From Swiss-Prot:
<dbReference type="GO" id="GO:0006412">
    <property type="term" value="P:translation"/>
</dbReference>
<comment type="similarity">
    <text>Belongs to the universal ribosomal protein uS15 family.</text>
</comment>
<dbReference type="InterPro" id="IPR012606">
    <property type="entry name" value="Ribosomal_uS15_N"/>
</dbReference>
<dbReference type="GO" id="GO:0070181">
    <property type="term" value="F:small ribosomal subunit rRNA binding"/>
</dbReference>
<dbReference type="Pfam" id="PF08069">
    <property type="entry name" value="Ribosomal_S13_N"/>
</dbReference>
<protein>
    <recommendedName>
        <fullName>Small ribosomal subunit protein uS15</fullName>
    </recommendedName>
</protein>
<keyword id="KW-0687">Ribonucleoprotein</keyword>
<dbReference type="InterPro" id="IPR009068">
    <property type="entry name" value="uS15_NS1_RNA-bd_sf"/>
</dbReference>
<dbReference type="InterPro" id="IPR023029">
    <property type="entry name" value="Ribosomal_uS15_arc_euk"/>
</dbReference>
<keyword id="KW-0689">Ribosomal protein</keyword>
<feature type="region of interest" description="Disordered">
    <location>
        <begin position="1"/>
        <end position="25"/>
    </location>
</feature>
<comment type="subunit">
    <text>Part of the 30S ribosomal subunit.</text>
</comment>
<dbReference type="GO" id="GO:0003735">
    <property type="term" value="F:structural constituent of ribosome"/>
</dbReference>
<feature type="compositionally biased region" description="Basic residues">
    <location>
        <begin position="1"/>
        <end position="11"/>
    </location>
</feature>
<dbReference type="Pfam" id="PF00312">
    <property type="entry name" value="Ribosomal_S15"/>
</dbReference>
<dbReference type="GO" id="GO:0022627">
    <property type="term" value="C:cytosolic small ribosomal subunit"/>
</dbReference>
<dbReference type="InterPro" id="IPR000589">
    <property type="entry name" value="Ribosomal_uS15"/>
</dbReference>
Amino acid sequence: MARMHARRRGKSSSVRPARNEAPAWSNTDKAAIEKLIVDLRKEGTSASMIGLVLRDRYGVPDVKMVTGKSIGDILTENKVSSEIPEDLRDLMVKALGLRKHLGENPKDLHNKRQLHLVEAKIRRLVKYYIGTRKLPAGFTYKPENAEILLSR
Protein backbone atom coordinates (compact mmCIF):
# COMPACT_ATOMS: atom_id res chain seq x y z
CA MET A 1 0.00 0.00 0.00
CA ALA A 2 1.11 3.52 -0.67
CA ARG A 3 1.25 6.29 1.87
CA MET A 4 -1.74 8.59 2.21
CA HIS A 5 -0.09 12.02 1.99
CA ALA A 6 3.17 11.22 0.20
CA ARG A 7 4.11 9.80 -3.16
CA ARG A 8 6.03 6.88 -1.65
CA ARG A 9 5.47 3.25 -1.02
CA GLY A 10 4.80 2.06 2.48
CA LYS A 11 7.18 0.14 4.71
CA SER A 12 7.03 -3.61 4.97
CA SER A 13 6.31 -5.09 8.37
CA SER A 14 6.20 -8.45 10.08
CA VAL A 15 3.26 -10.77 9.52
CA ARG A 16 1.53 -12.68 12.29
CA PRO A 17 1.77 -16.46 11.94
CA ALA A 18 -1.36 -18.13 10.55
CA ARG A 19 -2.76 -20.23 13.40
CA ASN A 20 -6.15 -21.71 14.20
CA GLU A 21 -5.57 -22.42 17.88
CA ALA A 22 -3.50 -20.83 20.61
CA PRO A 23 0.04 -22.16 21.25
CA ALA A 24 0.52 -24.63 24.10
CA TRP A 25 2.54 -22.15 26.21
CA SER A 26 -0.10 -19.40 26.12
CA ASN A 27 -2.68 -18.47 28.74
CA THR A 28 -6.06 -19.74 27.48
CA ASP A 29 -8.45 -19.16 30.39
CA LYS A 30 -11.28 -17.17 28.72
CA ALA A 31 -12.97 -15.87 31.87
CA ALA A 32 -9.69 -14.76 33.46
CA ILE A 33 -8.61 -12.95 30.29
CA GLU A 34 -11.96 -11.13 29.98
CA LYS A 35 -11.82 -10.10 33.65
CA LEU A 36 -8.23 -8.91 33.18
CA ILE A 37 -9.24 -6.83 30.14
CA VAL A 38 -12.07 -5.14 32.07
CA ASP A 39 -9.82 -4.52 35.09
CA LEU A 40 -7.08 -2.98 32.94
CA ARG A 41 -9.62 -0.72 31.22
CA LYS A 42 -11.02 0.44 34.58
CA GLU A 43 -7.45 1.41 35.55
CA GLY A 44 -7.40 3.70 32.50
CA THR A 45 -5.42 1.59 30.03
CA SER A 46 -6.29 2.03 26.34
CA ALA A 47 -7.42 -0.93 24.22
CA SER A 48 -4.15 -1.14 22.28
CA MET A 49 -2.10 -1.01 25.48
CA ILE A 50 -4.30 -3.77 26.95
CA GLY A 51 -3.28 -5.98 24.02
CA LEU A 52 0.40 -5.22 24.61
CA VAL A 53 0.12 -5.87 28.36
CA LEU A 54 -1.65 -9.18 27.78
CA ARG A 55 0.99 -10.21 25.24
CA ASP A 56 4.04 -9.18 27.27
CA ARG A 57 3.02 -9.89 30.88
CA TYR A 58 0.34 -12.58 30.71
CA GLY A 59 1.35 -14.71 27.70
CA VAL A 60 -1.73 -14.10 25.55
CA PRO A 61 -0.51 -13.76 21.94
CA ASP A 62 -3.96 -13.13 20.41
CA VAL A 63 -7.08 -12.30 22.44
CA LYS A 64 -9.46 -13.02 19.57
CA MET A 65 -7.99 -16.49 19.05
CA VAL A 66 -8.47 -17.37 22.73
CA THR A 67 -11.80 -15.71 23.54
CA GLY A 68 -13.43 -15.53 20.12
CA LYS A 69 -13.99 -11.77 20.62
CA SER A 70 -11.80 -8.75 20.07
CA ILE A 71 -10.71 -6.50 22.94
CA GLY A 72 -13.09 -3.79 21.71
CA ASP A 73 -16.03 -6.23 21.68
CA ILE A 74 -15.24 -7.35 25.24
CA LEU A 75 -15.05 -3.71 26.41
CA THR A 76 -18.39 -2.75 24.82
CA GLU A 77 -20.01 -5.93 26.15
CA ASN A 78 -18.99 -4.92 29.70
CA LYS A 79 -19.88 -1.23 29.09
CA VAL A 80 -16.39 0.13 29.77
CA SER A 81 -15.45 1.29 26.26
CA SER A 82 -14.66 4.95 25.68
CA GLU A 83 -17.17 7.25 24.00
CA ILE A 84 -14.60 8.39 21.40
CA PRO A 85 -12.77 5.61 19.49
CA GLU A 86 -9.09 5.29 20.37
CA ASP A 87 -7.62 6.11 16.95
CA LEU A 88 -9.73 9.27 16.72
CA ARG A 89 -8.75 10.26 20.26
CA ASP A 90 -5.04 9.84 19.43
CA LEU A 91 -5.38 12.00 16.32
CA MET A 92 -7.18 14.69 18.33
CA VAL A 93 -4.35 14.70 20.89
CA LYS A 94 -1.86 15.04 18.03
CA ALA A 95 -3.83 17.94 16.51
CA LEU A 96 -4.00 19.72 19.88
CA GLY A 97 -0.24 19.36 20.29
CA LEU A 98 0.34 20.76 16.80
CA ARG A 99 -2.01 23.69 17.50
CA LYS A 100 -0.13 24.47 20.71
CA HIS A 101 3.19 24.31 18.83
CA LEU A 102 1.88 26.58 16.07
CA GLY A 103 0.67 29.06 18.69
CA GLU A 104 4.26 29.41 19.88
CA ASN A 105 5.85 29.09 16.40
CA PRO A 106 3.46 30.67 13.87
CA LYS A 107 5.96 30.59 10.97
CA ASP A 108 6.47 26.82 11.11
CA LEU A 109 4.93 26.02 7.73
CA HIS A 110 5.85 22.32 7.73
CA ASN A 111 3.89 21.65 10.89
CA LYS A 112 1.08 23.88 9.67
CA ARG A 113 0.70 21.48 6.75
CA GLN A 114 0.88 18.51 9.12
CA LEU A 115 -1.94 20.03 11.16
CA HIS A 116 -4.06 20.32 8.00
CA LEU A 117 -3.36 16.67 7.14
CA VAL A 118 -4.15 15.44 10.65
CA GLU A 119 -7.38 17.42 10.81
CA ALA A 120 -8.40 16.11 7.38
CA LYS A 121 -7.85 12.58 8.67
CA ILE A 122 -9.90 13.39 11.79
CA ARG A 123 -12.79 14.63 9.63
CA ARG A 124 -12.68 11.47 7.50
CA LEU A 125 -12.69 9.27 10.60
CA VAL A 126 -15.57 11.23 12.14
CA LYS A 127 -17.58 10.69 8.95
CA TYR A 128 -16.81 6.96 9.08
CA TYR A 129 -17.67 6.59 12.77
CA ILE A 130 -20.96 8.47 12.34
CA GLY A 131 -21.80 6.05 9.52
CA THR A 132 -21.01 3.03 11.69
CA ARG A 133 -22.89 4.64 14.63
CA LYS A 134 -19.90 4.67 16.97
CA LEU A 135 -20.36 8.45 17.23
CA PRO A 136 -23.65 10.37 17.52
CA ALA A 137 -25.11 11.79 14.29
CA GLY A 138 -24.53 15.45 15.24
CA PHE A 139 -20.86 15.01 16.18
CA THR A 140 -18.44 17.43 14.51
CA TYR A 141 -14.75 17.97 15.18
CA LYS A 142 -13.98 21.48 16.38
CA PRO A 143 -10.49 22.25 17.71
CA GLU A 144 -11.99 24.45 20.45
CA ASN A 145 -14.14 21.60 21.78
CA ALA A 146 -11.56 18.84 21.28
CA GLU A 147 -9.70 19.68 24.48
CA ILE A 148 -12.93 19.49 26.48
CA LEU A 149 -13.83 16.14 24.89
CA LEU A 150 -10.43 14.65 25.64
CA SER A 151 -10.39 15.76 29.26
CA ARG A 152 -13.41 13.58 30.10
